[in-house]
Amino acid sequence: NAKARPYMVCRSGSAGIQRYAQTWCGDNYTSWKSLKYNIPIITGMGLSGQPNEGADIGGFAGPAPTEELFVRWVQNGIFQARFSIHSASNDNTVTEPWMFRESADTIRDAILLRYRFTPYLYSAEYEASQTGAPIMRALVYDFQNDPKAWEESFEFLFGRDILVANVLEEGAKTRTVYLPAGCKWYDWNDKFRCYEGGQTIEVPVTMATIPMFVREGAVIAMADNQLMTMEGDHTTALHLIVAPKGTTTTTLYDDDGITNDFKSGVYRKTTITTTAGERVTMNFASEGSYKDTVETIKVEMIAKEKSPFWVTLDGRKIEHFLTRRKFDAAAEGWYYSQSKKAVEVKYANPAKNHALTVSFEQFDLIGM
């Protein structure tokens, strides 16, 4: 394909290599130590100007990984810019995602989660191409005024808004996590449980657990339709996880993923400006000529204090459903989840600039 963008991975390079190629951590040895220390290698490369870095998942040299080690390595690898499972094991085995039958579902779920993150990851790659911001970021990249962030080497930010603290110890039942100061954090695995930043917590883990925390102020884009490839499939059901705080701007970027047509304006860049307060308003503004593939939008907005009073789309009130069953059956509407303390809103993509407003204002109980 003469129009295709080149893709290059190289073993070595010098300052400026990020303009031409991805790099990787070298031929690592299969061990828990390699899994752990590949993280600061990747984040260190990010601080050195190379935003796209990855490691050989499962280890390149040495024996085949144990089942537990391989699961944990895949769970880490899904956040790397370059996610590659391959090996030249010394025991004549080949490392494959399906090599352990009992853990195949856990490994599959982790890989599918990466594909669900495609809108978020591709937008982060766009940001990297414009600013050099790493895909896997050392905590100190965003939290330079927090002394403890300077000391943390084995947690990282996936893009701007998701803190990841992979399980890195054999047989672990808990994971100690430092949450940087300056904002609140919401536990991805515990119904968005809220933690104040600037503290160390301990969370329980199983083999399936990937400790992740949503940063206050985040808008995280996911695909609710399960993507299976990064270039052939497109997001048709967009899912936005929102943790309102102040005024924030999030950019979603999309193009065909293959050609250089984006250079002539064939791309789609959507800027989401979220303003928090008694009314939370999300303004969506798009540019570019690339066809919008999104058919439906679901907004999952963390709202720990109370349920909204009303929700509008471009000033038109959206129907409120009191039961999950009726909400799930509807094409449009909103529902407040008591278990998560989050409001869910869904609607057909207007295919134009639009505004979604969620009101948490006080209201007249008698007058309503």
Model segments located where?
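Residue-identity detector for threonine
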Residues: 23, 30, 43, 66, ...
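Accessory, solvent-exposed terminal regions and/or long lumenal/extracellular loops of proteins
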Residues: 214-316, 324-325, 337-354, 359-368
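Catalytic-domain carbohydrate-binding cleft regions of carbohydrate-active enzymes
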Residues: 1-209, 214-215
